């Protein structure tokens, strides 16, 4: 293979991610040419509707997957938190790269800390997971749907539409945005549990031995273990990328620390768990935790959450 083609969304963050993988591939494989093929996904085009109301899985991945299945491209680079837990026939999750900062952060032009936000402050996010946890901490907040790429969200913040917005620290760091805003307040994981796979890049590829061989060096053992726990948890709960589920696993030596939360978008009802498991249990602990949540009513709670989101 002389040319490897990467399917990519056209946002600044998506292009950064694809360029990052392109550079690593070319450094690893002398003589390999790598091209980016830009395209728009459903999630990029429909910007006037909250993601949960658009419905379906793979809002930011389907068009990229179609291009791989048609032979137009060979791989796609995603924020792993946007990658569905099930793959179409002929496609595989070929690599999980080393993780960036997994935390969510409050970005504001006026308020330094989350506790500084005034009563009924306007906070922008389209994520039901973030909304759930924000309202659990501060039921008075006015959570407003905020769509668009990172630059669009920052512009709306600076124009005064919001008192604060919520972004992933990984995106802030990758795009070097710290100097563009006045205040960044990263949430503790116990305050705001991240989405599955948050902070990691996932490389999806056609199920072709030659291509998979070129990609496998990108795998990071720690990230593979952590995200396996997280994705197993979400898979068993049958939760997509747009439901209020937070799950984070952190490998520390021979132990895995896990935080998980499932609940209603308004934060009025939640199921939570914090635990420590052995590293050797990483292939089972995510499923076991999901079964515990199901026994505690998580599936019924998620069904109600979906109904609330579609009102």
Swiss-Prot record:
The answer, when asked if Transferase is one of the entry's keywords, is yes
Name its pathway: Porphyrin-containing compound metabolism; protoporphyrin-IX biosynthesis; coproporphyrinogen-III from 5-aminolevulinate: step 2/4
Sites of S-(dipyrrolylmethanemethyl)cysteine modification? 241
E.C. code? 2.5.1.61
Show the catalytic activity: 4 porphobilinogen + H2O = hydroxymethylbilane + 4 NH4(+)
UniProt keyword list: Porphyrin biosynthesis, Transferase
Taxonomic superkingdom? Bacteria
Record keyword Transferase present: yes
Report the InterPro entries cross-referenced here. HemC (IPR000860), Porphobilin_deaminase_cofac_BS (IPR022419), Porphobilin_deaminase_N (IPR022417), Porphobilinogen_deaminase_C (IPR022418), Porphobilinogen_deaminase_C_sf (IPR036803)
Gene3D superfamilies the record matches: Periplasmic binding protein-like II, Porphobilinogen deaminase, C-terminal domain
Q: Which GO terms describe its biological process?
A: protoporphyrinogen IX biosynthetic process
Q: How is the cofactor bound?
A: Binds 1 dipyrromethane group covalently.
Q: Per UniProt, what is one GO molecular function of this protein?
A: hydroxymethylbilane synthase activity
> What's an example GO cellular component term for this entry?
cytoplasm
Q: Which CDD domains match?
A: PBP2_EcHMBS_like (cd13646)
Instruction: Give the required cofactors.
Output: dipyrromethane
Q: What else is known?
A: The porphobilinogen subunits are added to the dipyrromethane group.
What is the role of the protein in this entry? Tetrapolymerization of the monopyrrole PBG into the hydroxymethylbilane pre-uroporphyrinogen in several discrete steps.
Subunit annotation: Monomer.
In the record, the note on similarity to other proteins reads:
Belongs to the HMBS family.
Which NCBIfam families does the protein's record reference?
hemC
Q: What is this protein called?
A: Porphobilinogen deaminase
Q: Which organism is it from?
A: Campylobacter curvus (strain 525.92)
Q: What is the lineage of its organism?
A: Bacteria, Pseudomonadati, Campylobacterota, Epsilonproteobacteria, Campylobacterales
Q: Which gene encodes it?
A: hemC
């Amino acid at each position: 293979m002389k040319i490897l083609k990467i399917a990519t969304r056209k946002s600044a963050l998506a292009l950064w991610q694809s360029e990052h993988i392109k550079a690593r591939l070319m450094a690893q494989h002398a003589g390999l040419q790598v091209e980016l093929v830009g395209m728009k996904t459903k999630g990029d085009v429909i910007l006037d509707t909250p993601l949960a109301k658009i419905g379906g899985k793979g809002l930011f991945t389907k068009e990229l997957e179609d291009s791989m299945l048609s032979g137009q491209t060979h791989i796609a680079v995603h924020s792993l938190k946007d990658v569905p837990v099930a793959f179409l026939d002929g496609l595989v999750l070929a690599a999980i790269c080393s993780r960036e900062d997994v935390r969510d952060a409050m970005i504001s032009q006026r308020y330094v800390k989350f506790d500084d936000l005034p009563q009924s402050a306007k906070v922008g996010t389209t994520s039901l997971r973030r909304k759930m946890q924000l309202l659990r901490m501060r039921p008075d907040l006015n959570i407003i749907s905020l769509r668009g790429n990172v630059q669009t969200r920052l512009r709306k913040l600076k124009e005064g539409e919001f008192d604060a917005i919520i972004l992933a620290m990984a995106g802030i760091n990758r795009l070097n945005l710290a100097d563009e805003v006045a205040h960044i307040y990263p949430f503790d994981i116990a305050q705001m549990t991240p989405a599955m796979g948050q902070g990691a890049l996932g490389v999806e590829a056609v199920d072709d031995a030659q291509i998979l061989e070129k990609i496998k060096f990108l795998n990071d053992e720690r990230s593979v273990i952590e995200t396996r726990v997280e994705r197993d948890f979400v898979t068993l709960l049958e939760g997509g990328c747009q439901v209020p589920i937070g799950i984070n696993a952190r490998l520390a030596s021979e132990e895995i620390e896990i935080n998980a939360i499932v609940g209603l978008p308004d934060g009025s009802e939640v199921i939570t768990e914090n635990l420590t498991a052995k590293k050797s249990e990483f292939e089972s602990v995510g499923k076991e935790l999901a079964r515990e949540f199901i026994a505690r009513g998580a599936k019924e709670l998620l069904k109600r959450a979906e109904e609330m989101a579609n009102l």
